[in-house]
Amino acid sequence: MWPGILVGGARVASCRYPALGPRLAAHFPAQRPPQRTLQNGLALQRCLHATATRALPLIPIVVEQTGRGERAYDIYSRLLRERIVCVMGPIDDSVASLVIAQLLFLQSESNKKPIHMYINSPGGVVTAGLAIYDTMQYILNPICTWCVGQAASMGSLLLAAGTPGMRHSLPNSRIMIHQPSGGARGQATDIAIQAEEIMKLKKQLYNIYAKHTKQSLQVIESAMERDRYMSPMEAQEFGILDKVLVHPPQDGEDEPTLVQKEPVEAAPAAEPVPAST
């Protein structure tokens, strides 16, 4: 190794071979350090801002006092102790694997205590959502589903898949159902195979919605032909959920406060019009 070699040629072969300095310096012309300009500063600022936005979100840490001292949990692990599972964001294979693992763990602890699943998802991959759905139906625990924010596409299917009577939503959430979408490329035969597969998935999803909403297949097909957005009250009438909650039971209350459907005022009776001759 040649210590002392600098790109700028200020110090070349400074230790053992000083005679090589002029020769090597001729091949490495002096370079000035880049000057800091306004454009460079703005570019650096934009780069740092983009890096910060791509960084993973911070997960809060909960510290609890125990008889053996302090114990720290990340917030999702602490909620898991209370049998709460969060399905947040797009549903893909990684989210499905985490949710399935939590469901199986909670069943191993007790197969009778309910599991609370909070959903705020725009949907995602159909096969990943069906993996969560099948696990929900497989385990023995009753599952309470809660819609916070939105439950769209596969999110609405998971919301409807909760135990009957235990499917909830907060009053300002949005629910959306639609038919599956996808694309295919390649040879004509391959495209035909993909089209046949997505049609099978479409019928499979229709049957699942019909099972949990108690609607006929004709009603489901008509509702899911295009994006169908619903308020919590509309989703309750459709059969996707059972209750729209304002807040949990307070002291002295047996049941949580529900959003009541506003009564429709009857139109005033029209006065009879005298017959004209």
UniProtKB/Swiss-Prot annotation:
Q: Which UniProt keywords apply?
A: Acetylation, Deafness, Disease variant, Hydrolase, Mitochondrion, Protease, Serine protease, Transit peptide
Q: Transit peptide, first to last residue?
A: 1-56
Query: Residues where N6-acetyllysine occurs?
Result: 211
Quick check: keyword Transit peptide in the entry?
yes
Q: Which domain of life is it from?
A: Eukaryota
Q: What does this protein do?
A: Protease component of the ClpXP complex that cleaves peptides and various proteins in an ATP-dependent process. Has low peptidase activity in the absence of CLPX. The ClpXP complex can degrade CSN1S1, CSN2 and CSN3, as well as synthetic peptides (in vitro) and may be responsible for a fairly general and central housekeeping function rather than for the degradation of specific substrates. Cleaves PINK1 in the mitochondrion.
This protein is called: ATP-dependent Clp protease proteolytic subunit, mitochondrial
